[in-house]
Every structure is written in structure tokens, then in C-alpha cells.
Amino acid sequence: MTTGISSTNNRAERTPPKGVALWWKNNRKGIISPLFGIGGFLLFWQLSASLGLTKLAGPLSLFTEERTRDLLFYPFFDRGGLDKGLFLHAMSSLSRVALGYSLAAIVGIAVGIAVGLNKALDRAFDPLFQFLRMVAPLAWVPIALVLFQNNQPAAIFVIFITSIWPILINTAEGVRQIPQDYRNVAQVLQMSNRSFFTKVLIPSALPYIFTGLRISIGLAWLAIIAAEIVMPGTPGIGFFIWDAYQNSYVSDIVLGVIWIGAIGLILDRLMTWLQKRISSDH
């Protein structure tokens, strides 16, 4: 009798909770498929490096190279100056992105709404906006250095001028796409400008605004990495990669690229989560 009860308890302990089982059933394809894809890519990369098909260090070098292994497992050290762990370099880059991207979001949304509401402004400035958005981030670096004579504000300007255009253009398009029926109802109800803005314009244009914001966060992250590479003495992941290249630390470069990709992915997922959260409230 005791044995039967014990056996039943053991089976109950081995049975996963229904919540976990249901979550795994619903999400396993989304987890297993990427793992196979990433694993296959890493295996191909390591084999290519081991067979001498590429001079790029394989992923195993992150663990076999002592210097890179220390950087991987100890990202928080600070020996002063530019000799910092990767986490601190990443925080330096992200602080610049936060400033430049926030300015781009504020200005881009405000100007985009104005342009979307006013056809004369749209006709006057759309060619200029389309022209400026084609300029590559690196092309803005020397202009920013001439303007500000200092790396920090110059880097923030490069982020701002690179990331503002998707926000501005998508916001303007979202405002232009507000159905005419909504505008007519607002006129019939004699809605105030404030009510029209909060109850009609913003909810209607929000998907377009977030499309611009999501595109721009990626551009902002790419821009700061490029700017840090060519701005000497500026702590950040871009500087870390360039310094590793100059000293022929190939595995350090690989580690830096992994950090860049991981942070970029996190920023994109955060923006997607924020979009779903705010859109559901509207």
C-alpha cells in the first residue's frame, strides 16, 4: 500500500505543471527552430575556422583564448581610462543612444505631425527629408565633429540625425492616413484641437509612429557603433572593436560583435513589447 502511494507521488513529481506543459506546447516550435538555425550556423563557422577556410576566429575561441575568456566572464571591470569591461563599454554606448534617440523621437513625432496636417509644409520639406535620410551615418561624423568640436555631443548628433527620419516620415504618413470620416465626425462634434489630437490623431497614427520608432532604434544603435569606431578616445563598443582590430585580437572582435547583435535584438524586442502594451491601451 505504501509502495503504491509512493509510486503515485513519484509520477506526480515527474509530471510537469499544466501551465509549463501548455507553454512549451505553444512555444516549442518558436524555440527549437531558432536553436537549430543558430547551432547549424555556429557549427559551420567553427568548421570553417578549424579547416583554415577563413582567418576569422571560430566561436570556440571565445573560451580558448584567455584574454577573450576573461572579457566574456568579467564584463564589469574598470581599470581606469578606456580599459573597461564590455558591460561598461555597452553602457557608454547606450547612454549616447538614449539621448540621441530621445531627441529624435521628440522632434520627429512633433515635426511629422505638423507635416502630416499641413499639405503646404509637406510639399515644401518632403524633398529635403528624403534627401537627408539617404546620407549614411559615417558621412555625418566629420560634420558633427566640425560643428561641436567634441566627441560626446558629436556622437549624440550623429545618432539624432540618423534616426530621426524614419520617425518623422512614418509619423507624417500616419497622420495623412487618418480616414476622412474621422475628420468629418470631429468637425460635426466640434471637437477641440486637444480632443482631436488625443482621441483621433494619436490613436490613428500610433501604428505608423511605432513603425518609425522601431526602425530608428536599430539605426541609432548602428550609428553609435560606427561613430565610436572613427572617434578616437571615446569609450563604447565601437571603440572596443576598433581597438581589438588594431591589436589583432580577432576573438575579441567576435565577442564585441556578439554583444552588438545581442543588445540590438534586445532593443528591438523591447520596442515591440512597448508597442503592443501601448496599442492595447488604445
Task: Identify what each model region corresponds to.
Residues 25-28, 87-95, 99, 122, ...:
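Alpha-helical membrane-interface segments at transmembrane helix boundaries
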Residues 1-39, 269-282:
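Transmembrane alpha-helical segments of polytopic membrane transport and secretion proteins
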Residues 130-166, 173-174:
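Generic hydrophobic transmembrane alpha-helix motif, especially the helices
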Residues 167-209, 241:
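Short cytoplasmic-facing helical segments at TM-TM junctions of multi-pass membrane proteins
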Residues 157, 161, 193-225, 255, ...:
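Transmembrane alpha-helices
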Residues 19-23, 50-102:
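Periplasmic/extracellular loop-to-transmembrane helix junction in inner-membrane transport proteins
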Residues 99-129:
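Transmembrane-helix boundary motif in ABC transporter permease subunits
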Residues 176, 211-214, 254-282:
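C-terminal transmembrane helix and the adjacent membrane-cytosol boundary/short C-terminal tail
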